[in-house]
Swiss-Prot record:
Entry protein name: Protein kish-A
Organism lineage string: Eukaryota, Metazoa, Chordata, Craniata, Vertebrata
Pfam families: DUF1242
InterPro entries per the UniProt record, alphabetical: KISH_domain, Ksh1
Entry keyword annotation includes Nucleotidyltransferase: no
Keywords: Glycoprotein, Golgi apparatus, Membrane, Signal, Transmembrane, Transmembrane helix
UniProt keyword Membrane present: yes
An example Gene Ontology CC term for this record: Golgi membrane
First-listed, main subcellular location of the protein, grouped into a coarse class: Golgi
Protein encoded by which gene: tmem167a
Amino acid sequence: MSAIFNFQSLLIVILLLICTCAYLRALVPNLLDKNKTGILGIFWKCARIGERKSPYVAVCCVVMAFSILFMQ
């Protein structure tokens, strides 16, 4: 089933996108900083969410991991 139609899969994709963008921005800041607008600006925004809300994102990742491992 597609991640669009399954809510849990959609949340997983969004969490992975946020974590990946924050990690890439930490490694190569210029890669995401030059594209702050447009369709590629989504990745910059995800990186900012990952940096600023990192404790909440980490808790969401742990909760999602436990729900995948033990509730499915």
